[in-house]
Amino acid sequence: MSKFIEPSVEEIKLEKVYQDMGLSDQEYEKVCDILGRQPNFTETGIFSVMWSEHCSYKHSKPFLKQFPTSGEHVLMGPGEGAGVVDIGDNQAVVFKVESHNHPSAIEPYQGAATGVGGIIRDIVSIGARPINLLNSLRFGELDNKQNQRLLKGVVKGIGGYGNCIGIPTTAGEIEFDERYDGNPLVNAMCVGVINHDMIQKGTAKGVGNSVIYVGLKTGRDGIHGATFASEELTEESESKRPSVQIGDPFVGKKLMEATLEAITFDELVGIQDMGAAGLTSSSSEMAAKGGSGLHLRLEQVPTREPGISPYEMMLSETQERMLLVVEKGTEQKFLDLFDKHELDSAVIGEVTDTNRFVLTYDDEVYADIPVEPLADEAPVFILEGEEKNYNTSKNDYTHIDVKDTFFKLLKHPTIASKHYLYDQYDQQVGANTIIKPGLQASVVRVEGTNKAIASTIDGEARYVYNNPYEGGKMVVAEAYRNLIAVGATPLAMTDCLNYGSPEKKEIYQQLIDSTKGMAEACDILKTPVVSGNVSLYNETKGTSIFPTPVVGMVGLIENVNYLNDFEPQVGDKLYLIGDTKDDFGGSQLEKLIYGKVNHEFESLDLSSESEKGESIKTAIREGVLSHVQTVGKGGLLITLAKLSAHYGLGLKSSIDITNTQLFSETQGRYVVSVKSGKTLNIDNAIEIGLLTDSDNFKVTTPYTEISENVSDIKQIWEGAIAQCLTTQD
């Protein structure tokens, strides 16, 4: 008789306990077919988390297959803890982005902190040392106190974990819109570097080899966290606070260093982070990849308190834990290493040749499941979408007051400087950061070399909402441009697909169309997808977020010497590259004037993107350009103002466009500054101005003139978010 009080197999079926765990009737019946019997309580829980949306991608898997995943530089693509891309000299860059949206909505500090910790462990599990962190965040508007609380908590959580573990946070993006009220998006990305011969895989093979648990003792925190992340947020979500994990960055630091030492041992067979679904996913996935079985003896698992059941052990998402498979007879070597780093560890099982996932506690069997169906045979749902009717009419912007519009856009939190928030992150720890958070991609030197890794993270939610296919292309192209802007060669990307409920036809169609656009852009821009994450059911009280695919992209700088003087100077001429059109659908201007975004916009010419990108990258590396900035949210006038304010330089510009085109967000444009004495040879580059040593920012068109003090612009732009957060308290 079991020492743990749990529902019987009959009660699970009759009372439909499986539904509370997240399994549908159809899925429960499939589990019964796989087992040839009714599952017990622990087995039902295991299937529920492994077949959750968060772990199985059961609504998105068909779309992910569209993405190109191989390329000249790709060493390891989707399927492992993170993607691995060659950077030459027997070195590789390892990177991935993950979401922690639902936990951050309930417990913003811990939700964000554990999101950072989890993505770090994904990189470390490959064997790479992390070199920087990035994040992409979405919140509701800051005139709402709940959104202020969420923003403050998330930023503190990101900084609190990253700063303590000693990894710089070097880039990010934050946007605000009421569509994210109560459902913030917290996407964390980590980048690491590794030598080719140290790359690890999460595999369990070699009959008789031992399974070692290391890290924090297992508690009851985070139980069914993967299932929670696969549900819509409701008024009952607050009661699921225990599903939010608790991070410990100091143990995280010890675990990182111990893991990086362990991978130097030849006796290590495989390693995987215990992330979503905890011990269940890490162990069963390792067995599936190794074509093996596993027998875990759960009484050997280090626990925080007595009485934790097998069900709780397997579904707990206690943080700062890793699972290793090591050669039989070498266990003590690893246990001694972990003891040296003051970490709890234990041998908890072994690899078998049964292809079954067997769990015992004091010799009593609590689960006996075939490995392959558990890990690889979650049902895949192909639903029916419904095309949105796009509004092809044109809004009228002829009545706008240019100066008033300029200042309203400049101080909107989406456009305003994020330094008030980013200054809470350690951007320099490790002393390899070359370009910090600001106007373009970040750049971090590869220690001991003259190479650097450029990284960026970007999203274009309003455009994806207006036209998912074109918006999908745009988000990839935006990340590409941000890497080009620092002279990097884009190598590959990771993605985080944040959407509402796929069971709603319009949202399912958004998934179909946006991933198609993303895949096309990846193919043309030669940026294969090597890792990623899907977060669905991002809804609050029945209202969905904007469809928000986020792209993290990395690029290589072979020699950083050109960055020594890559900063705009007085006397540099300014050029605009790319055409400006009447392009306001999805723009900040449309939202400001009309309160919503629902109009079409110009399609993106991806072949032109590639050609412009190569020309600009060449001009940077040849020392012609002192600065490159992509024209983004708010349009050209806002881009020029941010350039002037960020560097404290005067600016004088004359541009032959209309007043409204000052705020157009036509894609594929760059503002570049050309060094004195240098000549720019790029087709269709138009000279538009000059950087000066005055405090004057002056932009003229045939129809208007904006003339303001740079110091005033800087004060408004840099102070807007702080003002929102302090005056509303």
Curated annotation (Swiss-Prot):
ATP binds at Y57, K96, D495, G532. Substrate binds at S99, H100, N101, H102, R121, Q245, E317, T318, Q319, S535. Transmembrane segments: none annotated. It holds the Pfam family FGAR-AT_linker. Mg(2+) 1 binds at E98, N533. One of its GO terms (molecular function) is phosphoribosylformylglycinamidine synthase activity. GO terms for biological process: 'de novo' IMP biosynthetic process. Disulfide bonds: none annotated. It catalyses: N(2)-formyl-N(1)-(5-phospho-beta-D-ribosyl)glycinamide + L-glutamine + ATP + H2O = 2-formamido-N(1)-(5-O-phospho-beta-D-ribosyl)acetamidine + L-glutamate + ADP + phosphate + H(+). Monomer. Part of the FGAM synthase complex composed of 1 PurL, 1 PurQ and 2 PurS subunits. Part of the phosphoribosylformylglycinamidine synthase complex involved in the purines biosynthetic pathway. Catalyzes the ATP-dependent conversion of formylglycinamide ribonucleotide (FGAR) and glutamine to yield formylglycinamidine ribonucleotide (FGAM) and glutamate. The FGAM synthase complex is composed of three subunits. PurQ produces an ammonia molecule by converting glutamine to glutamate. PurL transfers the ammonia molecule to FGAR to form FGAM in an ATP-dependent manner. This is Phosphoribosylformylglycinamidine synthase subunit PurL.
